[in-house]
UniProtKB/Swiss-Prot annotation:
UniProt cross-references to InterPro entries, sorted A to Z: Ribosomal_uL5 (IPR002132), Ribosomal_uL5_bac-type (IPR020930), Ribosomal_uL5_C (IPR031309), Ribosomal_uL5_CS (IPR020929), Ribosomal_uL5_dom_sf (IPR022803), Ribosomal_uL5_N (IPR031310)
GO MF annotation, one: tRNA binding
Organism: Streptomyces griseus subsp. griseus (strain JCM 4626 / CBS 651.72 / NBRC 13350 / KCC S-0626 / ISP 5235)
UniProt KW Nucleotide-binding keyword: no
Gene responsible for this protein: rplE
Description of how the protein assembles with itself and partners: Part of the 50S ribosomal subunit; part of the 5S rRNA/L5/L18/L25 subcomplex. Contacts the 5S rRNA and the P site tRNA. Forms a bridge to the 30S subunit in the 70S ribosome.
SUPFAM superfamilies: RL5-like (SSF55282)
Record protein name field: Large ribosomal subunit protein uL5
């Protein structure tokens, strides 16, 4: 039987980052220190309204990237201008928690983001007011798991990092300590 090891980023958070954040914001209680709750990876496939086979490629890509089978998002109501019917698949999303979340975040920060051409850093203004951060990626090729020769088309995705931070400053400090490459104004 092999012993399971904690993800690298999770260990760093517990040993170094939590202590730094506690000093920085002078928390009384250890439970006040912000941490990660979940990461939601969403891939909208608007063209799936016209061609239903496109959703299969998105599901396959997301499964390969995250290691978890995505849930297919369906249209809530019909919209004639978009040629959209209620119940039609229009995207897929994955919610990552626990060790899978830490592993995915580590891979994204250390491998995927540096592979983006002309990458200048993530915008520090994309927080939602409650310490959660959302950023978009324009193509799925930046992940090593995706074989460039086998993709049927380029798909972007939204990645939302949900934290226990109460405001944007705490969330920004947490993500900066975790290694998010924010742009300096």
């Amino acid at each position: 039987m092999t012993a399971t090891t904690a993800p690298r980023l999770k260990t760093r958070y517990r040993e170094e980052i939590a202590g730094k954040l506690r000093e920085e914001f002078s928390y009384e209680n250890v439970m006040q220190v912000p941490g990660l709750v979940k990461i939601v990876v969403n891939m909208g496939v608007g063209d799936a309204a016209r061609d239903s086979k496109l959703i299969d490629g998105a599901v396959k890509d997301l499964t390969t990237i995250t290691g978890q089978k995505p849930a297919v998002t369906k249209a809530r109501k019909s919209i004639a201008q978009f040629k959209l019917r209620e119940g039609q698949p229009i995207g897929c999303h994955v919610t990552l928690r626990g060790d899978r979340m830490w592993e995915f975040l580590d891979r994204t920060l250390s491998l995927a983001l540096p592979r983006i051409r002309d990458f200048r850093g993530l915008s520090p203004k994309q927080f939602d007011g409650r310490g959660n951060y959302t950023f978009g990626l324009t193509e799925q090729v930046m992940f090593h798991e995706i074989d460039q020769d086998k993709i049927d088309r380029v798909r972007g995705m939204d990645i939302t990092v949900v934290t226990t931070a109460t405001n944007d400053d705490e969330g920004r400090a947490l993500l900066r300590h975790l290694g998010f490459p924010f742009k300096e104004n």
